[in-house]
């Protein structure tokens, strides 16, 4: 973390408060997330950072410079993070600059807003001191027979690019946001990873069914690689914002029925939306039994092997409204809200996020078992 940028980006009158917030956040992360090390474990996370770099901020105003430091502080506690909702790259590049030169990232191009993808990118961020990119990455494009039933009829403008037609009638479409897959390695652990931001649609009806179908399609399609990948010594990890409603909801069943496993340590992690009642974000595996057994033998605190970071536990709390009152009142939405303190609780999700990071701790050093096998002949 390049903390010297605080002197450059944070006005002197705000610096003491911002540094105090960073110290408080660091203390929280020390309590909740295991310390990074260079040998035994990989800390892997997924985080939907709301409207990062979006030019149209829906009337909530721009992110404050201090927020980039808070986001970077959270990201810095992991070795590898799949990030959703990265739009234009100006804010993202500020955050990665704060992280420092040891960090690298790869990303998709923006999705076409006309296709329902909101102009978003899917992104992988990784600490090069721990993770090696294996030079293969790509977006998943479904063959015609696997296209997703559309809950919304495409316009004539984009019918040719997103739908298969019979007698000029659309019968299917690609993902609203194309899943992004890549190969990485950390020590002995090789993994093929795919991140998603699944279409939300609605809470019921055809749009919910389209959401479920997107989950099924990516789990089935990516899961077909499992046998070959495991033979080659690679684990499959499917993660991101699935917009899964609950652990027993059919959105979750759509993921698990394809053979992916969500370890108990993750199933028992807190909900990742602000209201703490939805399990939108997930990390699922097709991997060796030993990898999952390691996750299941989790403890608490420094011994934890999965969790979710409550980003509003100590920052942007209701009690800190006065610190941000001027910024809140300066937004264009403020004119339409009489209760500024209630509006602030919504505004803060456009500063930090409306999702909590979900993370796991994976064992990546197989030296001992390898040497034992070698000695056994």
Residue spans of the language-model regions?
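Active-site beta-strand/loop signature of hydrolases that rely on acidic residues for catalysis
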Residues: 44-49, 74-93, 125, 182, ...
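Short amphipathic alpha-helices and their capping/turn segments at secondary-structure boundaries
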Residues: 23-38, 181-187
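Stable alpha-helical elements in mature extracytoplasmic
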Residues: 67, 71, 88-91, 95, ...
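Metal-dependent phosphoester/phosphodiester hydrolase catalytic core
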Residues: 176-178, 184-220, 375-376
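Structured beta-strand-rich core segments of catalytic domains in phosphoester-bond hydrolases
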Residues: 22, 82-189
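Metal-dependent phosphoester-hydrolase catalytic domains
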Residues: 1-31, 89, 224-235, 243-377
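Active-site-proximal beta-strand elements of phosphoester/diester hydrolases
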Residues: 41-54, 135-139, 190-200
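Acidic/histidine-rich helix-loop elements
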Residues: 49-65, 167, 202-210
């Amino acid at each position: 973390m390049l903390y010297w940028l605080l002197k450059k980006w944070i006005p002197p009158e705000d610096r003491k408060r911002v540094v105090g917030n960073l110290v408080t956040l660091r203390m929280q992360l020390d309590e909740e997330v295991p310390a990074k090390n260079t040998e035994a474990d990989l800390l892997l996370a997924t985080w939907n950072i709301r409207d990062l770099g979006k030019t149209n901020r829906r009337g909530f105003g721009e992110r404050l410079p201090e927020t980039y430091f808070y986001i970077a502080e959270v990201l810095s506690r992991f070795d590898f993070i799949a990030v959703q909702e990265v739009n234009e790259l100006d804010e993202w590049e500020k955050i990665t600059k704060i992280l420092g030169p040891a960090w690298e990232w790869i990303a998709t191009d923006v999705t076409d807003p006309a296709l329902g993808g909101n102009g978003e990118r899917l992104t992988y961020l990784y600490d090069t001191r721990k993770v090696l990119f294996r030079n293969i990455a790509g977006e998943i494009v479904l063959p015609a027979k696997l296209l997703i039933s559309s809950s919304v009829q495409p316009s004539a403008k984009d019918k040719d690019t997103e739908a298969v037609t019979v007698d000029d009638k659309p019968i299917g479409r690609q993902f609203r946001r194309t899943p992004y897959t890549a190969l990485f390695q950390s020590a002995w652990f090789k993994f093929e990873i795919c991140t998603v931001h699944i279409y939300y649609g609605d809470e019921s009806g055809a749009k919910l069914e389209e959401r479920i179908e997107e989950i099924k399609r990516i789990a089935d399609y990516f899961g077909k690689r499992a046998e070959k990948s495991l033979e080659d010594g690679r684990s499959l990890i499917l993660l991101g914002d699935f917009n899964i409603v609950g652990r027993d909801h059919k959105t979750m069943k759509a993921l698990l029925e394809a053979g992916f496993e969500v370890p108990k340590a993750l199933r028992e992690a807190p909900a990742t939306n602000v209201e703490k009642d939805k399990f939108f974000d997930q990390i699922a595996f097709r991997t060796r039994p030993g990898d999952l057994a390691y996750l299941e033998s989790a403890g608490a605190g420094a011994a934890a092997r999965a969790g979710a970071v409550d980003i509003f536990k100590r920052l942007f709390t209701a009690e800190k409204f006065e610190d941000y009152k001027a910024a809140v009142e300066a937004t264009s939405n403020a004119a339409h809200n009489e209760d500024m303190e209630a509006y602030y609780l919504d505004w803060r999700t456009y500063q930090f996020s409306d999702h909590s990071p979900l993370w796991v701790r994976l064992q990546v050093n197989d030296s001992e078992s390898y040497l034992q096998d070698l000695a056994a002949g």
